[in-house]
């Protein structure tokens, strides 16, 4: 599974309250959630997110266990999230809603805002097309990869009957 897009680079410890503030949790439509993604940190994020790969530092998605965080990013048009590390529950929620995620230690030093990047989720490789740099991350394998390939957990369960 390969994904290519423009990098939007953010910092460490971006929690789910920043990804989608609690006041929007009454909504379930990913497109509506996406209009408010990252609002406290970057109010312009929804305008920049379509076709982008979100690159972040350590502990991305920490905080409360809200599936809407991954849905908001997907609804905003984010193609994938690459981070130095993830909160475990966000990582699984992203896979369950069909949002590709890849852990790649050191990614923030090697990718700048606006760089063109290509992810190989199965191989755990990030290529910075702009600079030629290759970053080796942790490959996604097994059931999480199968769920992601199916487009999320619900699609996986429908197709496995």
UniProtKB/Swiss-Prot annotation:
CDD domains: IPMI_Swivel (cd01577). Pathway: Amino-acid biosynthesis; L-leucine biosynthesis; L-leucine from 3-methyl-2-oxobutanoate: step 2/4. Coiled coil: none annotated. It holds the Pfam family Aconitase_C. Its EC number is 4.2.1.33. GO terms for molecular function: 3-isopropylmalate dehydratase activity. Heterodimer of LeuC and LeuD. Belongs to the LeuD family. LeuD type 2 subfamily. This is 3-isopropylmalate dehydratase small subunit. The lineage of its organism: Archaea, Thermoproteota, Thermoprotei, Thermoproteales, Thermoproteaceae. The gene is leuD.
């Amino acid at each position: 599974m390969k994904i290519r897009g423009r990098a939007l680079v953010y910092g460490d410890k971006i929690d789910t309250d920043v990804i989608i503030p609690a006041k929007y949790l009454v909504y379930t439509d990913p497109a509506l959630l996406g209009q408010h993604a990252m609002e406290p940190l970057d109010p312009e994020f929804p305008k920049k997110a379509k076709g982008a790969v979100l690159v972040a530092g350590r502990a991305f998605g920490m905080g409360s266990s809200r599936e809407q965080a991954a849905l908001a990013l997907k609804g905003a048009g984010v193609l994938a999230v690459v981070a130095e590390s993830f909160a475990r529950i966000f990582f699984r929620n992203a896979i369950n809603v069909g949002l590709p995620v890849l852990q790649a230690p050191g990614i923030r030093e090697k990718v700048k805002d606006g760089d063109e990047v290509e992810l190989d989720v199965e191989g755990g490789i990030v290529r910075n097309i702009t600079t030629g740099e290759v970053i080796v991350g942790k490959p996604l394998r097994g059931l999480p990869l199968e769920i992601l390939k199916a487009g999320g957990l619900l699609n996986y369960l429908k197709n496995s009957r």
